[in-house]
């Protein structure tokens, strides 16, 4: 987006309001979502989380040993490809994080919208990563993982529940179980968690979701294809 334009102003205000550490607009559920999918580098990480979800939803599908190997290879491959795509994009465009924009750079955008103003005391709800914002790694990993699992199962419509693997790191997540009616719903929630957490712009999420799905579609069509 043009940082002086209305689309940027809307995204700036959205993350400023919802993603602040002391936000009064973020709901309890949105706060839970931000923590549930945080998956920082000191824990399971997003690729590890989606490998765990894959194991959970595939374990009762009566897969053979070879089918299991194929599934894990495809899912692992797409997670690796997602990281390459996302981080290549991050350092190609070098877009600043919301926390930097809100605390330091807002006046430089020359945006006439009064919502685009500097707040030196603003803090993100979850820790802001130390690398560029665009696009979202979380959203790329999530979309790629969910799409590949859907390819393997032949459907996106999977009802499942899941507990966070980061309960030691985030004790507030103990006994918290989240429920979804589709794999894509879980992937979108995973990506939106970064807006609720104050570390990504909405555009980071939306573009990354499309990239992740494309990565999975390409890998499924070309690699480890079943023998007829």
Outline where the language-model segments fall.
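Acidic/polar surface patches and capping/hinge elements
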Residues: 1-228
């Amino acid at each position: 987006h043009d940082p002086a334009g209305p689309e940027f102003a809307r995204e700036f205000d959205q993350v400023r309001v919802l993603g602040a550490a002391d936000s009064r607009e973020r709901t309890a559920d949105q706060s839970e979502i931000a923590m549930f999918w945080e998956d920082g580098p000191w824990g399971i990480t997003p690729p590890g989380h989606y490998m765990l979800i894959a194991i959970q939803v595939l374990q009762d599908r009566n897969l053979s040993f070879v089918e299991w190997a194929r599934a894990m290879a495809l899912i692992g491959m797409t997670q690796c490809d997602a990281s390459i795509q996302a981080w290549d994009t991050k350092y190609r465009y070098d877009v600043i994080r919301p926390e930097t924009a809100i605390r330091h750079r807002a006046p430089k955008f020359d945006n006439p919208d009064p919502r685009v103003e500097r707040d030196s005391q603003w803090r993100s709800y979850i820790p802001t990563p130390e690398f560029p914002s665009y696009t979202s790694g979380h959203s790329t990993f999530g979309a790629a993982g969910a799409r590949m699992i859907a390819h393997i199962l032949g459907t996106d419509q999977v009802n499942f529940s899941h507990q966070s693997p980061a309960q030691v790191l985030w004790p507030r997540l103990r006994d918290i179980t989240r429920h979804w009616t589709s794999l894509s719903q879980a992937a979108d929630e995973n990506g939106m968690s970064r807006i609720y957490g104050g570390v990504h712009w909405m555009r980071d999420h939306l573009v990354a979701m499309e990239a992740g799905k494309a990565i999975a579609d390409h890998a499924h069509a070309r690699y480890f294809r079943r023998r007829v």
